Amino acid sequence: MMKVLVVVALLVTLISYSSSEGIDDLEADELLSLMANEQTRKECIPKHRECTSNKHGCCRGNFFKYKCQCTTVVTQDGEQTGRCFCGTPPHHKAAELVVGFGKKIFG
């Protein structure tokens, strides 16, 4: 009986040690991933900023990635130019409204 307890204790110790090593490796991988995501966030274009030169570089919002929305602007000289900005499309706004309403109702 004593030998069984010693073997079980040894196995528990080995399993806990190996799982803690795995957790440390996982934390290191997550840290590298978070650092890469942070670098991406710094390079993306925030909401309401101009994205005319980089139409696919908008940042992520709460639920969806912002979309580059373009409009035609008439300058004081009468010249028409296209200007784009990162924003939330109407169908994404509606989805966010429904999700927010659902959270209020269901907790």
UniProtKB/Swiss-Prot annotation:
It is found in: Secreted. Disulfide bonds join 44-59, 51-68, 58-86, 70-84. Residues 21-41 form a propeptide. This is U1-lycotoxin-Ls1r. One of its GO terms (molecular function) is toxin activity. The lineage of its organism: Eukaryota, Metazoa, Ecdysozoa, Arthropoda, Chelicerata. One of its GO terms (cellular component) is extracellular region. Pfam families: Toxin_35 (PF10530). Expressed by the venom gland. Belongs to the neurotoxin 19 (CSTX) family. 04 (U1-Lctx) subfamily. Residues 1-20 form the signal peptide. The presence of a 'disulfide through disulfide knot' structurally defines this protein as a knottin. It comes from Lycosa singoriensis (Wolf spider). Keywords: Disulfide bond, Knottin, Secreted, Signal, Toxin.
